[in-house]
Amino acid sequence: MKKNLKILVITGGVISGIGKGVTSASIARLFRYDFRVTPIKCDGYLNTDPGTINPVEHGEVFVLDDGGEVDMDFGHYERFLNLNAKSSWNITMGKIYKKILENERKGKYLGRTVQLIPHVTDEIKSTIFQIASSENSDMLIIEIGGTVGDMENILFIETVRQIRQEIGSGNISFIHLTYVPSPAGINEQKSKPTQQSVKTLNKAGIFPDLIIARSSQVLTDQIRKKVAMFCNVESTSIIDNVDVSTIYEIPISFYKQGVHEILSSKLNIKVDPKIEELSKLVGVIKSNFFVPKKIINIAICGKYAELDDSYASIRESLVHVAAHLDLLIKSTLIDSNDLNESCLKEFDGIIVPGGFGGKGYEGKIMAIKYARENNIPFLGICLGLQLAVIEFARNVCGILDADTEENLARDKPLKSPVIHLLPEQKGIKDKGATMRLGGYPVILKKNTIAFKLYGQDRIIERFRHRYEVNNDYIDLFAKNGLIVSGFSSDFKMAKLIEIPENKFFVACQFHPELITRIENPAKLFLGLIKACI
């Protein structure tokens, strides 16, 4: 680990879900050009990772190149920093306790009583410093999940307090993201929740150097002075984080408010954020948000419709495409359980994303059929590919009982498994981290839509699945107009399908939304929207 390692710690207060991940990524972006920045997310839940958590409860599961299933905030880290994160950077209390219990069984504590302090905090510290060492990091951005005062994150808070004592206060800075409400009918900002949140943090031995106020409007001078007085910070160290048309405005806003200068002064470093390229792209997004040159309406037909964060990366992919094509994309999440054709008539394109289980199958299949028959641009992702195959088998090839082995809701034995379990998955009982996960090569067939979009015959994409297209049916599909345009590197598994006769009917087994960048939008989303214009 470098002797001059710098650490920024981001905590949250008042309520959860106010954007710590975006805030952390935005601050990290200001330092990315001058420092080797490594983002770390600390989550207090006892799951080893979020891979088995319902997206409606915790947001989408983000899959990394190394196969790790991590918190959705890593999507923000990767997109803002243009890097490929590692699963070890997501520290969960489940991982920490598992390691401690394993060490205890191995006798590594030499008969001592294993306690929360020092053993748990020491293990967290060790993990953090190991990451810094292995990545040769100049700077760590440590986001502590949840809200200050939660029982789940107390030990993470204590750990970063101890780290300050070990590396010196000049090498670490604490940033607190809080919420300043303006209750309806009062029309006045309230600082008391922020004061209480900071006092809770103070009781744990942490005194923030920077307070970032999440609110609907810029803080009034009165509120700013009040927060400064009762939270022991300079008024210049209280930063506005107001509602914006796109999250990519936030690094620019922080830059204009001098966040990088405040933190650089505290840490005794110099930085040049180089914000120009991002500013140009954000300018395009903002101009189309207020006065759109063209509007494209996209339906996202998914089963996790209760929470927008379930499909966060898909929405971001569309934002990236919009910035490059100079237009506005309006995406609407439609519950696949309530789908009917009348719901889809107003849309220029349709996306059927991934998911698990049989719930909502038939609604998605109906949407796919509607897109195919009406030549509406369509993109299927993961399960979306599998259901596109089922729809084609049933309605074009005449295999009326075509289905997937995953659908356990059948009342009859499956005779035509056009989608079946991956051979490597047979016999696996555990659910966590047992799928085909991570980055794998895909070989593209020349003279196909996919090949034209990517401009090369070999790509790397990220996967998260247990089921695949049954090769026994591929020739039949091809005879009827659906071809395989992308294969696994051994040519044994179909990874991309398309219908050449349609304007854009493409489906992939991988998740292209996981590698999109605002500087370089995912190619399949780019192709989808171009077909909608």
Swiss-Prot record:
Residues that coordinate or bind UTP: 16, 190-195, 226
Signal peptide: none
UniProt: L-glutamine binding residues: 355, 383-386, 406, 466
One annotated GO molecular function: metal ion binding
Binding residues for ATP: 17-22, 73
A GO CC annotation given for this chain: cytosol
Keywords assigned by UniProt, alphabetized: ATP-binding, Glutamine amidotransferase, Ligase, Magnesium, Metal-binding, Nucleotide-binding, Pyrimidine biosynthesis
Binding site for Mg(2+): 73, 143
Subunit and interaction comment: Homotetramer.
Protein known as: CTP synthase
Organism per entry: Borreliella burgdorferi (strain ATCC 35210 / DSM 4680 / CIP 102532 / B31)
